[in-house]
């Protein structure tokens, strides 16, 4: 199973590294959609992915998330906000899930 991390971000330099560092090893691709950052958000993201896209903010989170999802090639899309992160034990649960996840499963949700 291939997992795509899809994120929409704007001015998240204070938290983005922690988020991506905690999730990167479980993801097969990382897609960052930037809605107009003026800080180092995109520079931080380049340490984890080259799939960074600019998206003009329209005031519609669903539109931005759908744009991010349209860039994904994974079997599953993991969405996260930049201030979210996985604790090591949660990361291990996700890595284990990837090994046993059945193709007919369409939705997985983790508590945080």
Which role fits each region the language model picked out?
Residues 22, 26, 34-44, 57, ...:
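A conserved acidic beta->alpha catalytic loop
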Residues 27, 49, 72-74, 105:
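Short, well-ordered alpha-helix to beta-strand connector turns
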Residues 42-71:
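Conserved donor nucleotide-binding strand/loop of the catalytic core
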Residues 77:
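Short aromatic/hydrophobic "clamp" motif used to bind/position activated sugar donors
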Residues 84-112:
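Conserved donor NDP-sugar-binding/catalytic core segment of glycosyltransferases
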């Amino acid at each position: 199973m291939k997992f795509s991390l899809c994120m929409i971000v704007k001015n998240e330099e204070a938290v983005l590294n922690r988020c991506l560092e905690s999730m990167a090893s479980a993801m097969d691709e990382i897609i960052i959609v930037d809605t107009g950052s003026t800080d180092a958000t995109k520079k931080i993201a380049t340490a984890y992915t080259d799939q960074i896209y600019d998206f003009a903010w329209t005031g519609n989170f669903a539109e931005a998330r759908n744009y991010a999802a349209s860039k994904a090639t994974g079997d599953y899309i993991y969405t996260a906000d930049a201030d979210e992160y996985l604790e090591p034990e949660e990361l291990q649960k996700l890595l284990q899930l990837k090994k046993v996840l059945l193709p007919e499963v369409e939705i997985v949700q983790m508590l945080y």
